[in-house]
A protein has these predicted regions:
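Hydrophobic transmembrane alpha-helix bundles
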Residues: 22, 35, 71-79, 103-105, ...
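Phosphoinositide-binding peripheral membrane targeting modules
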Residues: 27-43, 47-99
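Low-complexity intrinsically disordered segments
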Residues: 92-124
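Anionic N-terminal interaction surfaces
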Residues: 1-44, 100, 107-109, 124
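Charged, low-complexity, helix/coiled-coil-prone segments
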Residues: 10-23, 52-67, 120-122
Length: 124
C-alpha cells in the first residue's frame, strides 16, 4: 500500500498468513483466514466461515472492535469500482434483518479481489 493510499484511507490486501496468526485466539477450531484487506489500522478479514471487520480505536489502537458477520447473513453486496477522478472503491453489504448497508472503503486495485472473495464464500 502506497503512502498516498494510506493517507486517503484506501484498503489494500495484506498477508492472510500474518492475519491468521494474529487472529488465532478468536478463530474457531476449523476456521482460517483466506484473505485480508487493511485500511490504515482497520482490517476486513475473510475467513472460511465469516467476514470479520476489525476497528482499532483510540490513539494506541489497544481498544479493538471485532464485528463478526457470518456469510449466511449477507443477503446482497455491491462493489463500486473507482472512476477516472475517484481513486477509491467501495464495498456495501446488506445483512438479513437490516435495512442499511455496511460500507467499507477499498483501494481500486483490491475491488475485484474483494468481490471474488465474497462471491466464493457466498456462492461456492
Amino acid at each position: 500500500m502506497g503512502l498516498f493510499d494510506t493517507l486517503l484511507g484506501n484498503a489494500s490486501e495484506t498477508s492472510a498468513e500474518a492475519v491468521n496468526e494474529e487472529l488465532m485466539p478468536i478463530l474457531a477450531a476449523n476456521e482460517s483466514v483466506t484473505a485480508a484487506f487493511k485500511l490504515v489500522r482497520d482490517l476486513s478479514v475473510f475467513t472460511t466461515k465469516r467476514l470479520i471487520l476489525i476497528d482499532k480505536q483510540g490513539l494506541t489502537g489497544r481498544k479493538v472492535n471485532y464485528h463478526s458477520i457470518p456469510y449466511k447473513s449477507i443477503t446482497q453486496f455491491v462493489v463500486e469500482t473507482a472512476g477516472h477522478f475517484d481513486t477509491d472503491a467501495e464495498l456495501k453489504i446488506w445483512l438479513s434483518g437490516k435495512a442499511d448497508a455496511i460500507e467499507i472503503e477499498l483501494s481500486a486495485s483490491s475491488a475485484q479481489e474483494v468481490q471474488r472473495n465474497l462471491a466464493t464464500q457466498l456462492f461456492a
